[in-house]
């Protein structure tokens, strides 16, 4: 089976190339598996048409300004598709439906961005939003990953790194608003942003740096501790480099972890609801081999490697990323005939390089050192030393500023979600950021920012937990009607069939089984603060 087949099974999306960010293409609404599925229950009729075009689509080509150039404006399938470029190379697209609902929806990018405007996955996402009446917006953030794959766009280019870090999304949102207003003779009443992974980082960056850009922001699995994440990817790959685990060994590892932790929530259901309750130590809890290297036991080198794998990431004496919780080792549902653990193909990949290796290596070659070196071997990185470009990298790429006072003051609403079984980005970073915001912003953080942790969900979607849910509709209800979401009903699907449902609870509450009702039904669970 090829790496692409694995990714299709795990991510439920077609992928073109392993190096084009793979499953991180799930940054946009498709990662949610069920965007707009709750539209019928919405308190806002966001499908209602409020305006139509006030000029021809083609006439927008004359709208070029000093801030952006309109490259083309063409009528396609009941909408006006506008493409343009912002100096220097930030390409963007705005699609304007003939029947507009008065809202703008911008989608984020996965991984290291650069997905072209023609990218099939992103086009499908925008078409889905377009069908609801949104004017849709998208940008490649300043580079084309078909030409500059990975982080090669940052090779000796600080400007492109800044465009990727935050400038591309901001400038595109400004250009899009002008184009929308010109076409309909009416500005968007509400502006939204949605993204997962790097798209989640972009979402938090917008709230922190440009609080007036979006009224409602949906941030999924945000990679906001970007630099720490990259060190984590390298650390975990380095831990397993000399003695990589086989697929059989990962399944054996998962068996022992789930045997110890699955029922901590009172239910033995194949889902670790909150891995913080799980006390797992490889040296204590895994069977040790005596003699032959068998797949049902672990030798000393493997146990030592796993101990390092689950440890905090320390660089030059500073903890830059928390220890990874357990949970992503388990298998997800059967997608396209593939049953695989969450570690596949992130941590292990029989078909090629693990994704953590693919996604992390370019950070050391083109970003975190002043002197770029395309030949740099990340496995040689000395974690006792501090890279000479680290602080600048943090300033440009990390979205960790907890002071969201300006976003709150502007009545913005931030809804975030994160899978507890994410094999790439540590879910604990979402909780720590939420709690930091709570500590620094005056008033009740729940008034404008709510976080929903998703038990058993892998990176942005999939996994053994309830990973199919609509977070867009609750966000719109919150922004436009002031109805804050206390819970979101999620389901676990296999071949479009609902196997069970659970409520996702606003942090710090968690779903607790009432001990009476059917365990497959969300009504048998209550959101409680433990």
Q: Which residue stretches match the model-derived regions?
A:
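Cap/lid segment of the alpha/beta-hydrolase catalytic domain
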Residues: 111-185, 231-232, 374-387, 394-396, ...
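Bacterial N-terminal signal peptides
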Residues: 14-27
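Gly/Ala-rich beta-loop-alpha elbow adjacent to hydrolase catalytic centers
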Residues: 195-199, 203
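Alpha/beta-hydrolase fold nucleophile elbow
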Residues: 186-196
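Histidine-bearing beta->alpha loop at or near hydrolase active sites
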Residues: 449-462
